[in-house]
């Protein structure tokens, strides 16, 4: 089986970017409530 490196990188970025964005938003709102 041949692994498509570009596809793997694209999928990783596609998952990591929104996740980190939501995580930053959550941390900001959580720190504001305290």
From Swiss-Prot:
GO CC terms in record: chloroplast thylakoid membrane; photosystem II
PANTHER family: PHOTOSYSTEM II REACTION CENTER PROTEIN M (PTHR35774:SF1)
Protein family: Belongs to the PsbM family.
Compartments, record wording: Plastid, Chloroplast thylakoid membrane
InterPro entries assigned to the protein according to its UniProt record, in alphabetical order: PSII_PsbM (IPR007826), PSII_PsbM_sf (IPR037269)
Keyword list, A-Z: Chloroplast, Membrane, Photosynthesis, Photosystem II, Plastid, Reaction center, Thylakoid, Transmembrane, Transmembrane helix
HAMAP family: PSII_PsbM
Organism: Pleurastrum terricola
Membrane-traversing stretches: 5-25
Predominant location: plastid
Function: One of the components of the core complex of photosystem II (PSII). PSII is a light-driven water:plastoquinone oxidoreductase that uses light energy to abstract electrons from H(2)O, generating O(2) and a proton gradient subsequently used for ATP formation. It consists of a core antenna complex that captures photons, and an electron transfer chain that converts photonic excitation into a charge separation. This subunit is found at the monomer-monomer interface.
Membrane topology according to the record: Single-pass membrane protein
Protein name: Photosystem II reaction center protein M
């Amino acid at each position: 089986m041949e692994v498509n490196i570009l596809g793997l990188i694209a999928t990783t970025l596609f998952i990591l970017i929104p996740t980190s964005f939501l995580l930053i938003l959550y941390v900001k709102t959580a720190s504001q409530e305290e």
